[in-house]
């Protein structure tokens, strides 16, 4: 029979196997009306660098689902691709240019920058895709997409123009989130709010022509330079007399009115709020309602502009310091309180964002959000776990219009052209040569690009060739499941849903499988700053892709963060070793090319393993249907390690080493059948090792990845016999425990007595004598119906079907053992005395470190338990 290498070394076969799969075209499904499609689109990794452990988890989960469905006979399509990642990539490229040439963005033309950006994209896209291949990802590489390639660009242009024509995209002056570092607008979803310990400054605003003043509380005194009113609640008795009066804006001298607006919370601060419509979204709404002027006091780099008077040119924080000082000097600062509040930060560079009045492009969200909410509420799209549905619905129920323009160069340029002569804006699917109104050729395109997530939102259908009516769209759309992290539910998941409903009139996927973050062994998020990140390729290089995949998925529950450690990696590598060695044993004992399973004359152990395997098939399939991939992996681990390797292989040895050719033929067929089909169950999780072993087994078909997924078989259900085998195995475990407790050498045989009450149990142990003698080191197995026949000097253990007893003289030299135990007791007593002496010493307990004191307490507990055990053993031996 064929053999595999003596030791498991994934480097010897992983690349070879992946090339074999690629050559055979197994990853590229054909459109087959006879087959059901199963489709996943990859969350496209950003072309900003390399894959991290989160990508490895995300893609392992997807590959498990795709490989499983492929084996079930589906036309399984996994579409790969990458994302241009506007802000992140532009920052990286500009950093590289600055390092190499000393030039900043201001020194470059758009074309010069884009040339370098495309070079970057090509380099890192190739690297990312090769890393996905290293992981074993069975994507259809013939359909690889990029969010800025020609087909995707056509889709983006079509969506923008279509939404513009429907009045769902507009350009307007609104408060947006501005990142002074990235120098671009951000959508609300791109702002991360962090708790910040700041202050509340209480400032006096004098009433014009009176001695009175109004006190307002603010966390941002620098924005008072842009105040145009002070608002109070119309029902607030404290200020009703001031409504309509004029205040003098401190430091600036501008006259501003006191207005009444129900937005004001009378219980916050003083109940009077400064209104700065150009620098606060809520103030903006008040400004619109009351027809107030908009005074912008900040430049795009977060310095004060010409509207800030003497503070012009100062950074926002410098201005704050100076303004507070000036207010204090003029007696207008009443008090300062510490105050904890949430401050928005740029999700890319962590700079504090600035709410800024700016002319930008927006998507009108209310008409798009309603149907997106409806499909989830109706259960047409299900979140796994269900709890993440709340994040989705909460975001859509409170959604604001989406700011989609970015002041960047890398991205989809907004397809809007401005006429220099008549001022008309032409929005067009094709690049226009003249103004559509006046015919002037004096037109120029909008300088801004679209938010990265705009093109990503079209991913489920743009990857299949939309807006063309392609065969792929007809057959593979909608997709089946989206696998992604919980951190981009609103960034990406929600947007794909509303865009798909708008343009495909259908949901983009049926399930959203959410996974958590991969954290380090201490539970910390992996990051460059902490230096605790582990490169997936490093793990693959040391241990192989299968070990990494299995480490990431075993025990992993949907939606939960997982801890990654080298210790877990070692466990998975040991599992692969165990499987490899067990497979070698099977291969060395098989007959050439016999793929039959012989069900006549099955031994008890054969029936047990076939029943257990059969149940595992049902359980694993059920787990995968429910997206319980971590549970499935754990069950496979236990089945392979404990039941197949530790039990069945050991139970098979007496048969294979016997002269009974018929029994050998049957057991060999069971070994091959269970191994073959267990490899199939394991294949989605550990594709390389399973393929390598399977190719060496007698098999039919080209590859395990297109072999049929195992099905539950009624003819392999031997539940009653399996229960009998479990009883025999329980007895073997009990005998092994007795031998271990008595320190008996593995080579020493001992008589075993099994006392039973029921005749059925007597028959079971009679039939299992051979197994007990071989696996428990028994010289003889005596089955008794009367417990009185058990010698007094025997070690015993109760099991479900009776009592196991091993006479002590069979195990040990009684006198020698008594002597050894008495010596051990003396040592233990000395340790107890030492620990008690320390713990009774008040000085030690008070002055020694808590850690040291606790260690002594634990030692005392341990030695006390040891003493009890020794004395029980001595009592038994002396009785």
Swiss-Prot record:
User: One of this protein's Pfam families, by short name?
Assistant: Val_tRNA-synt_C
Q: Can you say where in the cell this protein is located?
A: Cytoplasm
Q: What GO cellular component term, any one, is given? A: cytosol
Binding-site positions, ATP: 528
Might you name a Gene Ontology BP term for this protein? valyl-tRNA aminoacylation
Q: Where is this chain primarily localised?
A: cytoplasm
The superkingdom of the source organism is Bacteria
Q: Where is this motif: 'KMSKS' region?
A: 525-529
Q: What class of enzyme is it?
A: ligase
Q: Which reaction does it catalyse?
A: tRNA(Val) + L-valine + ATP = L-valyl-tRNA(Val) + AMP + diphosphate
PROSITE patterns documented for this protein: AA_TRNA_LIGASE_I (PS00178)
- One MF term from GO for this chain? ATP binding
Instruction: Report keywords, A-Z.
Output: Aminoacyl-tRNA synthetase, ATP-binding, Coiled coil, Cytoplasm, Ligase, Nucleotide-binding, Protein biosynthesis
User: Could you say which EC number(s) this protein's record lists?
Assistant: 6.1.1.9
Q: What note about domains is in the entry?
A: ValRS has two distinct active sites: one for aminoacylation and one for editing. The misactivated threonine is translocated from the active site to the editing site. The C-terminal coiled-coil domain is crucial for aminoacylation activity.
- What does this protein do, in the record's words? Catalyzes the attachment of valine to tRNA(Val). As ValRS can inadvertently accommodate and process structurally similar amino acids such as threonine, to avoid such errors, it has a 'posttransfer' editing activity that hydrolyzes mischarged Thr-tRNA(Val) in a tRNA-dependent manner.
Which PANTHER family does the entry mention? VALINE--TRNA LIGASE, CHLOROPLASTIC_MITOCHONDRIAL 2, VALYL-TRNA SYNTHETASES
**Subunit structure of this chain's protein:** Monomer.
Name of the protein described by the UniProt record: Valine--tRNA ligase
Q: Which organism is it from?
A: Caldanaerobacter subterraneus subsp. tengcongensis (strain DSM 15242 / JCM 11007 / NBRC 100824 / MB4) (Thermoanaerobacter tengcongensis)
Lineage of source species: Bacteria, Bacillati, Bacillota, Clostridia, Thermoanaerobacterales
